[in-house]
Amino acid sequence: MAKSKKIVFTGGGTVGHVTLNLILIPKFLKDGWEVHYIGDKHGIEHEQIDKSGLDVTFHSIATGKLRRYFSWQNMLDVFKVGWGILQSIAIIAKIRPQALFSKGGFVSVPPVIASKLLRVPVYVHESDLSMGLANKIAYKFATTMFTTFEQSKTLVKTRHVGAITKVGMTRFDNSDQLDKIKEQFDEKLKTVLFIGGSTGAKVFNDFISKTPELIENYNIINISGDSSLNTLERHLYRVDYVTDLYQPLMDMADLVVTRGGSNTIFELLAMKKLHLIVPLGKEASRGDQLENADYFERKGYARQLQEPELSWETLKHELEQLVEHAETYKEAMAKSEEITSPDDFYNLLVTSISNK
């Protein structure tokens, strides 16, 4: 009797640490793998797995936040991480998987360490130009770390694969909701979509609310992350969260204003969408979005605007520059070789696991 194939996924805290897992899991299931997921039952990873309806066994563990600064909470979280490692050892020892795949986030650290201790191959994916703290730890225990960006040659366990995105051919959804949105929009105006990651961006939400010039000069789509803002009125559609409408709304947009998260900006690259990046600053993050934005600007894929400089005048100028030089930006995006299909990455991952 053939040995059953089993794989454990981990990663969470934000949608960005779950998205790739949700792309890969159906492929493993289709090929007959038994799939497990280790995460926090209160985290977005459990919510997303549950919502997906996929045949995945979810295992919840204790998690502690990894901080780069001093906090008394660090003392308590050391014990939480330790307990999470012990829980992960028990879970993984019982499953006996062929591999563990981690997409990062603080919840991934205990399963990664546990897998290494149990001699289970560990495969990690890093989306950003520089590693987050969780993946810096994970790298030490990894068999291979796949990266979106080229990394230093001193990081011998990394393998550059480019961005893995499921965005492909444009889909059109002729839903009633889409028709209602179009009725409120002016065909003579450019449509600008604001997207701020999995939880929206308060700075975009507040800016749209306080800048009437926006809806006088553009059709505005605001994916806000805040259901209290939901509205459909003249030149303005605000929605907290979208699934089926995501691609149709992107199709409607002439321009996109986004944060600098790797998943989103590479999706925009794959769709060849003109976009302006307003990255999170170092005061609110580790600076990864600033690095991503600099990289995209250097490559000629996008323009960037720092959050403290965001105003009606600066935004209008940046959007006008994107429109004026649209062909240059679209040509640079068309020449990009930084996108990897999910099928190609899946085949690479399965081959790597099989060779261990």
UniProtKB/Swiss-Prot annotation:
Bilayer disposition of the protein: Peripheral membrane protein
Keywords: Cell cycle, Cell division, Cell membrane, Cell shape, Cell wall biogenesis/degradation, Glycosyltransferase, Membrane, Peptidoglycan synthesis, Transferase
GO molecular-function term, one example from the UniProt record: undecaprenyldiphospho-muramoylpentapeptide beta-N-acetylglucosaminyltransferase activity
Compartment(s): Cell membrane
Chief location category: membrane
EC numbers: 2.4.1.227
Catalysis: reaction(s): Mur2Ac(oyl-L-Ala-gamma-D-Glu-L-Lys-D-Ala-D-Ala)-di-trans,octa-cis-undecaprenyl diphosphate + UDP-N-acetyl-alpha-D-glucosamine = beta-D-GlcNAc-(1->4)-Mur2Ac(oyl-L-Ala-gamma-D-Glu-L-Lys-D-Ala-D-Ala)-di-trans,octa-cis-undecaprenyl diphosphate + UDP + H(+)
Pathway assignment: Cell wall biogenesis; peptidoglycan biosynthesis
Residues bound to UDP-N-acetyl-alpha-D-glucosamine: 198, 289
Pfam families registered for this protein in UniProt: Glyco_tran_28_C, Glyco_transf_28
Matches recorded under SUPFAM superfamilies: UDP-Glycosyltransferase/glycogen phosphorylase
One GO BP annotation of this record: lipid glycosylation
Gene3D superfamilies named in the record: Glycogen Phosphorylase B
Keyword Glycosyltransferase: yes
Any one GO CC term of the record: plasma membrane
InterPro entries: GlcNAc_MurG, Glyco_trans_28_C, GlycoTrans_28_N
Reported function: Cell wall formation. Catalyzes the transfer of a GlcNAc subunit on undecaprenyl-pyrophosphoryl-MurNAc-pentapeptide (lipid intermediate I) to form undecaprenyl-pyrophosphoryl-MurNAc-(pentapeptide)GlcNAc (lipid intermediate II).
Protein family membership: Belongs to the glycosyltransferase 28 family. MurG subfamily.
Protein's name according to its UniProt entry: UDP-N-acetylglucosamine--N-acetylmuramyl-(pentapeptide) pyrophosphoryl-undecaprenol N-acetylglucosamine transferase
Organism in which the protein naturally occurs: Streptococcus thermophilus (strain ATCC BAA-491 / LMD-9)
Name of encoding gene: murG
